[in-house]
Design a protein with these regions (language model features):
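N-terminal alpha/beta PP-like core and its mobile active-site loop of ThDP/TPP-dependent enzymes
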Residues: 1-176
Length: 176
């Protein structure tokens, strides 16, 4: 509640900088009626707005399933990052008639054969090709293919902070 949520600013910033999906669900004092006035109430939604892809207070119990699902979707989609959902005590206690939303399949855009062939043609025609390896390269299927690509082509490469370790940095092709 309130002040305790401030301890999550560092993980939220880290998720934003590192493109890591993170869903933060914080509590809050009741918003409809409160006997404690504003004691220990911090505007968590505003605090997290610059750090998160979305920062929302849930104000209706029927919206909990859809907002949680949307929070997870938004946190994972390109570019991943943090999403904050603030759930006040009185809203959390509301009865809801909304059904639980089943998980959905995640689909990534994949370039067609013609686009891949054209990209390969341009890369192979380059006079001094250089690879920049970033965060997207650390996906399971991409990293293995990228290591093979570097090995097969002999192209020099460097990486961003989030691309480190995808291809062996001890390689003579690594530029730092």
């Amino acid at each position: 509640l309130g002040p305790g949520a401030t301890n999550l600013t560092t993980p939220a910033a880290y998720a934003a900088l590192g493109a890591f999906p993170l869903v933060i669900i914080t509590g809050q004092k009741p918003i409809k009626t409160s006997k404690q006035a504003q004691f220990q109430i911090v505007d968590v939604v505003s605090l997290f707005t610059p750090l998160c892809k979305a920062s929302t207070q849930i104000v209706n119990g029927n919206r909990i399933p859809s907002l949680v699902r949307e929070g997870f979707r938004l946190a994972q989609e390109e570019r991943p990052g943090a999403v904050l959902l603030e759930l006040p005590e009185d809203i959390a206690e509301e009865q809801t008639v909304e059904p639980v939303i089943p998980p959905h399949d995640r689909r990534y855009a994949v370039a067609g054969d013609a686009a891949l062939d054209e990209a390969a043609r341009r890369i192979l025609a380059a006079q001094r090709p250089l690879l920049l390896i970033g965060a997207g390269a650390n996906r399971r299927r991409a990293s293995k293919a990228l290591r093979k690509f570097v090995s097969d082509t002999g192209f020099p490469f460097f990486d961003t902070q989030m691309g480190k370790g995808v291809v062996d940095e001890d390689s003579e092709l690594y530029l730092g």
